[in-house]
Amino acid sequence: MSQLTHINAAGEAHMVDVSAKAETVREARAEAFVTMHSETLAMIIDGKHHKGDVFATARIAGIQAAKRTWELIPLCHPLLLSKVEVQLQAESEHNRVRIESLCRLTGKTGVEMEALTAASVAALTIYDMCKAVQKDMVIGPVRLLAKSGGNSGDFKVDTHD
């Protein structure tokens, strides 16, 4: 099993030194879900929410969150992201919204946390915009779908979960 990289020999949290690492293209994808009543989902799909376009607002929030991950998650490096994409899809058969984020850069450290933050904040934004009509929405699961680039190699979740 790999060692925790954010813990030093004395057991203290620290920011990993990436200065000696080579710059490579790195990409990560994550997903999150928001489950709600069918009436709440229909309101979003039909564009009848009094606060405006829920998907557009959540998309922008997710993109902004990816760009500010280093301010939210301790020990994350500030990154020069070259691409952030947030896609939202209503899944009426499951009464939920699926959010998928993609982050990419050429750099010395990965973008997994940025992708996870983008998907999570987009989900939180949907909750915030819809809580006036439904407070018992459920956020989750949130997970990393895939990552590529860097020394640790590529990862892809088993989609048969």
UniProtKB/Swiss-Prot annotation:
InterPro entries recorded: MoaC, MoaC_bact/euk, MoaC_sf, MoCo_biosynth_MoaA/MoaC, Mopterin_CF_biosynth-C_dom
The protein's annotated pathway: Cofactor biosynthesis; molybdopterin biosynthesis
Pfam families assigned: MoaC
Binding site for substrate: 75-77, 113-114
Enzyme class: lyase
EC number(s) given by UniProt: 4.6.1.17
GO biological process: Mo-molybdopterin cofactor biosynthetic process
Catalytic site positions: 128
Annotated catalysed reactions: (8S)-3',8-cyclo-7,8-dihydroguanosine 5'-triphosphate = cyclic pyranopterin phosphate + diphosphate
Keywords for this protein: Lyase, Molybdenum cofactor biosynthesis
GO molecular function, one term: cyclic pyranopterin monophosphate synthase activity
Entries under CDD domains matching the protein: MoaC_PE
Keyword Lyase carried by entry: yes
Family: Belongs to the MoaC family.
UniProt function note: Catalyzes the conversion of (8S)-3',8-cyclo-7,8-dihydroguanosine 5'-triphosphate to cyclic pyranopterin monophosphate (cPMP).
PANTHER family noted in UniProt: MOLYBDOPTERIN COFACTOR SYNTHESIS PROTEIN A
Record note on quaternary structure: Homohexamer; trimer of dimers.
Protein name: Cyclic pyranopterin monophosphate synthase
Organism the protein comes from: Salmonella arizonae (strain ATCC BAA-731 / CDC346-86 / RSK2980)
